[in-house]
Amino acid sequence: PHSSYIPKQDLASVKENMKGDFIGIGVSFYNYKDSITVIRAIEGGPSFRAGILPGDRILMADDDTIYGQNWSDSKVIERLRGKKNSKVQLTIKRTGVDSLLDFEIIRSEVPIKSVVASYMINPTLGYVKINRFAESTFLEFEKSIENLLSEGASNLVLDLRDNSGGFLQIAEQIADEFLEDGTLILFTKNKTNEIEKIFATAKGRFEKAEVYVLINENSASASEIVAGALQDNDKGIIIGRRSFGKGLVQQEMDLGDGSAIRLTTSRYYTPTGRSIQRSYDKGSEAYYDDYYQRLEHRAVDTLQSDLLAD
């Protein structure tokens, strides 16, 4: 599972998403069962500002029907992206809402920052939200915690909700900030049962801190590595919903025609030997059905909470 082929026309946008800004509507999505389902609206982007929510299903873009068309990811991206300040009308199906919703999105620069929030909650408790583990994430994180430490932070809330993962090495660097030298962060095991152990190596700036890690059903892969390492080493309290359950390691290999493949090469385990990977025994459909059902329950729970709050 999670092995994939990336066509040449998709590869540039995939790599772009792990680097700089781009012009578009600013959503991460799953293309499954003829349905384009929003994982998250990127904070600071046009869809986030317009009120698009996780679990929303995009049915139409202007007069183009997207639902049921078997569009590839690259075609969806091509349709949703466009020139700066151009408009696109999205028709959305939202769980818990009977009627369809229309949103006018003005395409603009989508900020792809990893650390999207960093501030003091009280005189000793800092807060950092990381939305992905990309090339620049650790440098952004370092800068944020240096600022928090200068403001008096001795404890930290690490928000990994809706963080779908990224580079394993970056997750290891983040976890290292909370763990003492020589502490096991994770280990991987491949098909031949070869084991590779990853240990903390540097002096972490929050080794003595109380750490609270926020997760939800969209916290996956690298997010689960960090959360699992802190939990198993009794360095962090996990708060939130059950995470996605992706405990596999992929390696990307570029091909001669400009495309690439990502192959699952090993399974990772938390320090106590737990595998985060959800069962794939019933196949891809059941695997993702479980995820979508959880998204729908989340949307209903949110709607009910909003009604109670009113």
Regions found by a protein language model. Give the residues of each.
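PDZ/PDZ-like peptide-tail recognition elements
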Residues: 2-40
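Cleft-lining beta-strand/loop regions that shape enzyme active-site pockets
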Residues: 12, 37-40, 46-53, 62-65, ...
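A generic structural motif
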Residues: 30, 91-95, 269
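Structural motif
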Residues: 55-57
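Short, small/polar residue-rich loop motifs at catalytic or cofactor-binding pockets
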Residues: 262-263
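Conserved functional hotspot residues or short segments at active or partner-binding sites
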Residues: 271-310
